[in-house]
């Protein structure tokens, strides 16, 4: 389909119009839409074509000039989860239901249950014809969605590069999460950014951004130095105690809990939690990963029980 897509030479005199399109409209002009996605996006695969036909809760936005498709956004509706027990299970790492990629990630990693409760739209794909890139089409598409989408916040997950981070920042998004591992598809760390729209969405963006900025200096993430701050916050807050509890007694990941663990150990005797302190030095989980994690969780759990007495 990429070969069938007809590219349009850049012409600054042409007027670009942005509209929302239904799934039926996209499918009726499939060669054009999917051709653009394949031309401009490394992640687009035949599986995406199947999703176009089968998946529900999709939204599409097109930037056109004289019936030529110059740019497009493919977005997915997320959030609106009303089951509080399910949300708590997601936060603890006990459940990972299908879908809701960003709400689940923020609920689990940043402990923000509101991310699951609020309604959001995730930008799954954004593509602009190569000859029309760097001319504001992508920014205009995002601004149109911001003004017209009836949701609490927008989100995007992307392979982190300085250039992409700057683009999303220019569009009004705040970086709120960095994945632990390099993605096979991009060779980059996955990143999540948010843009609040409603009052609750704006508050969620603020909380998520502040939490990210507060915790990244105390993580062992390879990109932590990119986000260096003047001072490191060592104070144990309620969110840290929740992080410690969910690591010790449930399935919170070590990487997500690490800033809280480092704050916790800062207030303890140097002889406390020797396995965890060894991990701080070696960056290696003791023994094999499964049993080593159990030991680290147990060490923190025992200390939490003593501190609670």
Predicted features, each with a name:
Residues 53, 113-116, 134:
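Generic structural signal for beta-strand residues in well-ordered domains
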Residues 125-148:
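Conserved acetyl-CoA-binding loop-helix of GNAT-fold acetyltransferases
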Residues 68-79, 105-109, 122, 127:
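Conserved beta-strand in the GNAT
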Residues 40-52:
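Short, basic/aromatic recognition patches
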């Amino acid at each position: 389909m990429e070969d069938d897509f007809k590219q349009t030479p850049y012409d600054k005199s042409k007027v670009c119009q942005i509209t929302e399109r239904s799934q039926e409209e996209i499918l009726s002009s499939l060669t054009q839409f999917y051709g653009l996605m394949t031309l401009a996006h490394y992640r687009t695969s035949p599986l995406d074509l199947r999703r176009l036909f089968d998946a529900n809760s999709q939204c599409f936005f097109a930037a056109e000039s004289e019936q030529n498709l110059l740019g497009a956004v493919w977005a997915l509706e997320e959030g609106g989860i009303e089951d509080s027990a399910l949300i708590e299970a997601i936060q603890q790492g006990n459940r990972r239901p299908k879908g809701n990629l960003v709400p689940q990630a923020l609920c689990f990693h940043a402990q923000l249950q509101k991310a699951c409760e609020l309604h959001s739209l995730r930008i799954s794909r954004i593509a602009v014809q190569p000859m029309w890139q760097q001319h504001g089409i992508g920014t205009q598409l995002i601004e149109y969605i911001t003004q017209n989408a009836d949701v609490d916040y927008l989100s995007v997950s992307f392979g982190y590069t300085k250039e992409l981070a700057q683009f999303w920042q220019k569009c009004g998004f705040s970086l709120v999460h960095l994945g632990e591992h390099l993605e096979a598809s991009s060779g980059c760390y996955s990143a999540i950014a948010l843009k609040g729209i409603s009052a609750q969405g704006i508050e969620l963006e603020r909380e998520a951004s502040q939490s990210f900025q507060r915790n990244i200096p105390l993580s062992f993430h390879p990109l932590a130095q990119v986000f260096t701050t003047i001072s490191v916050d060592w104070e144990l807050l309620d969110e840290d105690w929740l992080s410690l509890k969910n690591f010790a007694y449930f399935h919170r990941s070590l990487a997500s809990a690490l800033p809280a663990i480092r704050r916790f150990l800062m207030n303890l005797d140097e002889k406390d939690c020797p396995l965890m302190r060894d991990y701080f030095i070696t960056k290696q989980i003791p023994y094999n990963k499964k049993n080593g994690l159990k030991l680290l969780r147990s060490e923190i759990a025992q200390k939490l029980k003593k501190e609670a007495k």
